[in-house]
Amino acid sequence: PTNHGITTWIGDRAGGAWRGTRRNDSHLPPEYDRNLRASEITLAEVMKKAGYKTFFAGKWHLGSKGSWPTDHGFEINKGGWDVGSPRGGFFSPWQNPNLESGPAGESLTLRLGRETADFIEANKDKPFLAYLSFYTVHGPIQTTPELWKKYQGKATAAGLAKERFLFDRRLSVRQVQDCPIYAGMIESMDDAVGMVLKKLDQLGLADNTIVCFTSDNGGVSSGDAFSTSNLPLRGGKGRQWEGGIREPF
């Protein structure tokens, strides 16, 4: 639902989007959709009509074939399809019909950053919309051995918390960011964002380009490997507390 809201700039329920664990609630009418409706006007469609070259890279998760990025205003699609997590994991070869696998072990996150930077360079002399939607930090939680070693033990050495988990009602919730794998994923995403910003600087486009950075939900602090903590905010992904819905923008 949040991806839908970012793509169309309207409320997800107003647009018919719903994602829940149960479908038998009497308050949820059956017309809620799994695909982004063809009738919805996306940001890409508006920009394309205004003469912008439009590009999408990464996680789409807004419908099956027939409702992919190229069906909703994006002229180029690198990696966007049905699923919300990367099939095959974060290292090549991956199982993605819209992104050719690179050399064995290539980072998906860095590849998406490079694809976006390459698109910007190819279209530096015309207006463009580049929408980079990382699969990171969705599961599976994976990083390189080098990054794992870099962050392993840092939380303990820093004395961030004595109790790693707290029981919140019926949920066991992570209380400290001490997952070295998750930290490695964040660094990879930072590097990929850096590729894009560096390319804008190199081409002299930084002062004439609007860059927006946001997220679709809080980190997973319960279940799914308890990958991170959102303290001092309560809760995380899938919860209506601030840890699940308060995002950077």
Describe each model-derived feature in a short phrase:
Residues 9, 13-24, 60-62, 66-68, ...:
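Active-site-proximal cap/lid insertion segments
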Residues 1-2, 42, 54, 109, ...:
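Ser/Thr-centric signal marking residues that sit
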Residues 4-61:
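Long, well-ordered early-domain segments
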